[in-house]
């Protein structure tokens, strides 16, 4: 795991929602994330450590209210944790580099993987592939 900033530093540099999601395994309200409807070509990075997580070509509209992807950029980019909270068994996904909470993965996505990586916008930074503009979720 990469060295990540201290909690004090993160609180100073992140919005309350970004801190809640990435550091406290929180979930932003559905259909509120800044990157939900982003359709530009580029790469989605971890907001905390800037590690690449998802290519825009793997993003799709699942209708669930959060950005959804069917495949990460690499196996190492995502860490998978069994999540038994809320009386349901799910698989939590975290950044493979800094361990920031991203969301969950479900086995109901499209082909070719059949997986839906349901990710909080607040855990992501998008970099536009054409002009390099960065947008924090």
From Swiss-Prot:
Catalytic residues per the record?
Answer: 118
Q: According to the UniProt record, what class of enzyme is this?
A: oxidoreductase
Task: Name the cofactor(s) required for activity, per the record.
Answer: Zn(2+)
Q: Which residues bind Zn(2+)?
A: 46, 49, 95, 98
Tell me which GO cellular component terms the UniProt record holds. Answer: cytoplasm
- Cite the GO molecular-function annotations of the record: peptide-methionine (R)-S-oxide reductase activity; zinc ion binding
- SUPFAM superfamilies found in the cross-reference section: Mss4-like (SSF51316)
Q: What is its EC number?
A: 1.8.4.12
Catalytic activities: L-methionyl-[protein] + [thioredoxin]-disulfide + H2O = L-methionyl-(R)-S-oxide-[protein] + [thioredoxin]-dithiol
User: What binding details are noted for the cofactor?
Assistant: Binds 1 zinc ion per subunit. The zinc ion is important for the structural integrity of the protein.
Alphabetized, the UniProt keywords read: Metal-binding, Oxidoreductase, Zinc
> Its domain of life?
Bacteria
Q: Does the keyword Cell membrane apply?
A: no
| UniProt-listed HAMAP family | MsrB (MF_01400)
Q: What is this protein called?
A: Peptide methionine sulfoxide reductase MsrB
Q: Which organism is it from?
A: Shigella dysenteriae serotype 1 (strain Sd197)
């Amino acid at each position: 795991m990469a060295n990540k900033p201290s909690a004090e530093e993160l609180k100073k540099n992140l919005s309350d929602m970004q801190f809640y999601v990435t550091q406290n395994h929180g979930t932003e309200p559905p259909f509120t994330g800044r990157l939900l409807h982003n359709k530009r070509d580029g790469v989605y990075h971890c907001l905390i450590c800037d590690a690449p997580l998802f290519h825009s070509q793997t993003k799709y509209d699942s209708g669930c209210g959060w950005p959804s992807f069917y495949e990460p950029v690499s196996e190492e980019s995502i860490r998978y944790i069994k999540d038994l909270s809320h009386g349901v068994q799910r698989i939590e996904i975290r950044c493979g580099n800094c361990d920031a909470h991203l969301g969950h993965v479900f086995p109901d996505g499209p082909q070719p993987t059949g997986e839906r990586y349901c990710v909080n916008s607040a855990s992501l930074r998008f970099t536009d592939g054409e002009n390099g503009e960065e947008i924090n979720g």
